[in-house]
């Protein structure tokens, strides 16, 4: 499976609780933080839920 780099680019202030929990589940706590995840359906679903708050790139 491919590796994904997920970076939080927007604040979670004024977001619904489910989106805040999605960011925490991805391991994103601070603005500008980058985490690496395996590409699987669970992770892709979480990313889709908060796609307006994060940027996603494929890791090299």
From Swiss-Prot:
GO BP annotations listed: translation
Key word Signal present: no
Gene Ontology MF term list: structural constituent of ribosome
One family name in Pfam for this protein: Ribosomal_L30
Cellular component, GO, one term: cytosolic large ribosomal subunit
InterPro entries: Ribo_uL30_ferredoxin-like_sf, Ribosomal_uL30_bac-type, Ribosomal_uL30_ferredoxin-like
Family to which this protein belongs: Belongs to the universal ribosomal protein uL30 family.
Quaternary structure (record): Part of the 50S ribosomal subunit.
Protein name: Large ribosomal subunit protein uL30
Native organism: Flavobacterium johnsoniae (strain ATCC 17061 / DSM 2064 / JCM 8514 / BCRC 14874 / CCUG 350202 / NBRC 14942 / NCIMB 11054 / UW101) (Cytophaga johnsonae)
Organism classification: Bacteria, Pseudomonadati, Bacteroidota, Flavobacteriia, Flavobacteriales
């Amino acid at each position: 499976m491919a590796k994904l780099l997920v970076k939080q680019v927007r604040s979670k202030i004024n977001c619904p609780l489910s989106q805040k929990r999605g960011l925490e589940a991805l391991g994103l706590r601070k603005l500008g933080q980058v985490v690496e995840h395996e590409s699987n359906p669970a992770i892709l679903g979480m990313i889709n839920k908060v796609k307006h708050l994060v940027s996603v790139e494929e890791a090299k």
